[in-house]
Amino acid sequence: MKFAVIDRKNFTLIHFEIEKPIKPEILKEIEIPSVDTRKGVVISGRGPIWLHCFLAHKYHHTPFVAVYDPRLGAVVVQSHSELREGDVIDVVVEEILKGGVRHV
C-alpha cells in the first residue's frame, strides 16, 4: 500500500493505492502520512470501507475530514471548522493527481 500526499491551499489530499488484496490486520501496521494539522484532509483511493473509516479516524484531529466520491466531490464526514458534515468540496482528485505527487 502506498500513499500520495498533495498539499492544497485549504486541505491536504491523502490518496492511497492498494497493490494487492489486504486484510483488516494491516490496520495494525499502517503508518499514515503526517499532515499540516491546520488544514483539513481529503481521503481518496479505492479500498474497503473499513480502511476509509480507519483513515478518517486517524485524521480526526484536523479541521475536517472529507472522503472523495468521483460523482460528487469530497464529502465532509467530520468537522471542527466552518464546514459541516454533508458539505461537498468541489474537487476532482484525478486532475490533482495529474499534477504530480509525492509518495510516502
From Swiss-Prot:
Annotated NCBIfam families: cas_csx3
Family in the record: To A.aeolicus AQ_377.
Full protein name: Uncharacterized protein AF_1864
InterPro entries hit by this protein: CRISPR-assoc_prot_Crn3/Csx3
Matches recorded under Pfam families: Cas_csx3
Organism for this UniProt entry: Archaeoglobus fulgidus (strain ATCC 49558 / DSM 4304 / JCM 9628 / NBRC 100126 / VC-16)
